[in-house]
């Protein structure tokens, strides 16, 4: 087995978690996140071909390091991921967690689900 980096990048790369599908159902694409500075919440969601070519950023999010954006394929073109919407003073205080469903081919957010995120039911 040969180990290969997802991309040539000096920051951290993150893959999905909790059983998420980092590979599209047709096995043609891989989704991952890039985080330039682990002390900040800014994170980018990227996709590439299965052979690790044709990398492209699909969305900018804010998330912590523990769970990351948990980006996951739903269909060959739809992904779901975690983000935070900022409001409050100067738009810098996190207000609520958001899960977005994005069409990676068009860049359109199809659905936005807002709610309190917690480990408690």
Please place each PLM-identified region on the residue numbering.
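Sequence signature of WD/YWTD-type beta-propeller architectures
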Residues: 1-121
